[in-house]
């Protein structure tokens, strides 16, 4: 049976939640993960899968009102290796554009893979375009990201053999100009090719374009190097300069954070980048108030095993660490950066790159931080393992969140 992924968009107009919810401890599931998983940039779809719903009733969240529309269909289900990219924008007039990695083939080669695009003028959800049949690009691509650019335009970035961008001056209509190559880095130890991009724009008329990306180079069958980069355009995407990401200032750009484990947001002249997804490093946020010319670092979550070598016996711990898996970032109109992290439990019970992840209703949740805070997220009892812990033992058994 061919698997089809239906991409739908919901606009949340109301939300209410109760304060406490009791869950039995048996809901927790354990998984073994290898931190050195190779990501190659031409990831294969997972193939045919059947999903069986297991309905439950929960008082935690109730949607009061929501507009929803199906905007595209794809048989390619691997939309990210970690974070979801900037796949949607809403312009000042309410218009919404959505992109996704799209294919209509049911095989593993997905030669038609590329960017599917749909557009809704002025935010009227009854007036979405027809579901796309063909990709925007002329070649096989993946991992699209989109943003407004200029007075009324839009810019699309995706990866093939490196990164390219496509631009049009009027959002939602007209021909795309491209591909315009975003240069791969020069002077690096290995010949890295940029992939897995996230794009955002800032400045007057959104003409300054910021792209964060990762790259991976295979050294031999057992070793590879990954590195984080930042590309910037000051003319709406026509010309580019690529350099190391702001992580470079702390010597953390290489072999620390994973590809696809980063996010970017802009508002006015403010730019913020989030890096997480590493059990060997802190969760870091870099903020610029001058459109990406200079950066300041903030630690969102302090990893008690920051910088540890997996082969070091001191990296072994059986006392659960509540740590981040993925994250999201936004900047409000006052320039405040908001960070959300989803939380899992981790144990590294033996030397080596494998660790155990516990996820389930007694572990999952969302931790929040913003840069008005003067310190990273901390536990009230001072236990660094529990700084992101959201569920506590409840009287009478189970876990309580509230």
How would you name each of these model-derived features?
Residues 20-402:
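Extracellular, repeat-based ectodomains that mediate carbohydrate processing or recognition
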Residues 1-25, 117:
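Bacterial Sec-dependent N-terminal signal peptides
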